[in-house]
UniProtKB/Swiss-Prot annotation:
Cofactor comment text: Binds 1 NAD(+) per subunit.
Superkingdom assignment: Bacteria
Pathway as given in its UniProt record: Amino-acid biosynthesis; L-homocysteine biosynthesis; L-homocysteine from S-adenosyl-L-homocysteine: step 1/1
Single Gene Ontology BP annotation: S-adenosylmethionine cycle
Protein's name according to its UniProt entry: Adenosylhomocysteinase
Co-factor requirement: NAD(+)
Catalytic activity, as annotated: S-adenosyl-L-homocysteine + H2O = L-homocysteine + adenosine
One term under GO cellular component: cytosol
Lipid metabolism listed as a keyword: no
Principal EC category: hydrolase
Gene3D superfamilies reported for this sequence: Adenosylhomocysteinase-like (3.40.50.1480), NAD(P)-binding Rossmann-like Domain (3.40.50.720)
Broad class of where this protein is predominantly found: cytoplasm
Gene assigned in the entry: ahcY
Keyword Cytoplasm: yes
Amino acid sequence: MNAVTKITPHTDYKIADISLADWGRKELDIAEHEMPGLMSIRRKHAQTKPLKDVRITGSLHMTIQTAVLIETLKDIGADVRWASCNIFSTQDHAAAAIAATGTPVFAWKGETLEEYWDCTLDALTFTLPDGTLTGPELVVDDGGDVTLLIHKGYELENGSTWVDEPASSHEEGVIKALLKRVAVERPGYWGRVVKDWKGVSEETTTGVHRLYQIAEAGKLLIPAINVNDSVTKSKFDNLYGCRESLADGLKRAMDVMLAGKVAVVCGYGDVGKGSAASLRAYGARVIVTEIDPICALQASMEGFEVNTIESTLGRADIYVTTTGNKDIITVEHLQAMKDQAIVCNIGHFDNEIQVDALKALKDVQKINIKPQVDKYVFPNGNAIFLLADGRLVNLGCATGHPSFVMSNSFANQTLAQIDLWEKRDTYEKKVYILPKHLDEEVARLHLEKIGVKLTTLTKDQADYLGVPVEGPFKPDHYRY
């Protein structure tokens, strides 16, 4: 699909179809009622505007729920530019609704990798009143792509030769080509970006892993808040969100009956736990694969068979990767699977499945069934179905997590952005987690919507436990 591009003195966007804005706005109105935490924060800060005129770049799935986040950031003062963090996850009517309000947004469903990284660059390119191109002061990231691009660009301007090294994947080659182009077209640009950049809040496990790697190498340029490991994110979005959205993606893609099927869930972290529960709830017989003995024991205690992928080949009907690691399902695994097996990923990146190697196989026929559903037929006549090209199945083949659970995640994101800005002179270049009292406050903001009434400690009870009457109620090391 060719995106519709509009550039004016007031706004710019690259989206699929601006005429979808009215539809998007109607769904936004519905979502707002399902996102009590985010809307409460919006109301609380609407007058004080703690992010007034702060330049924020967002790289996060351009869905209806994200549109509510964007409008919250705008309502509390921010100057926002946005791109999606996945080539298939954009809901085009959501992007249109945001573009129609004058917010620069660069996202459409079905981008090429080249288009995706161009959109990421567009989202982080701000123009100062004197015409100088600069970047964001804060970043909302999901998967760490904006963080990666800025760090690699800055390193290139300071002598790095990474862009000249052979690319390990097609996507890495696209990134390197983009950085080379920027070096020619915008000399010194990344230095200007880093000069004003005050922090990033990271949404997902994979992006957090990247942040810790950069920090451990001593190369982290800014303070970072790990939103993913807030309890009200990881134990809700990752677990309960996947519990609902995985089955939604599978059914929209394949109209498959899950009951009675053998389903393999690779990984039993929070995403894996939600995915296994999702499939079990529909009557699937679930097998879990794990490297971690603790997670493996948890899965076993929940009644799941825990085994290796190799032991399931030829008998499993569905495979779901959830690990955040690469090469979980190899091309050899794909060739040995049961005929008509369904393969998908609900971890952040497509390298959990060896998609590039699958596409490079000789004598393999690829048949597109419909958008984000491809059938690969091997020379022996057996076939597999690959969903969303190995990218996030719940967003590529459905609409992602429900609004209510995303309200938890995005309330954390908004609080993290406010915290980064208000403490920009005191935070160090490290990875932080939001404090416990904010985590509890995010949970508290969602209780009334679902009819929950909390018990209140007496002063004697609080003293006995050694906690304040109003909380926080658990130490930081408590595992929920």
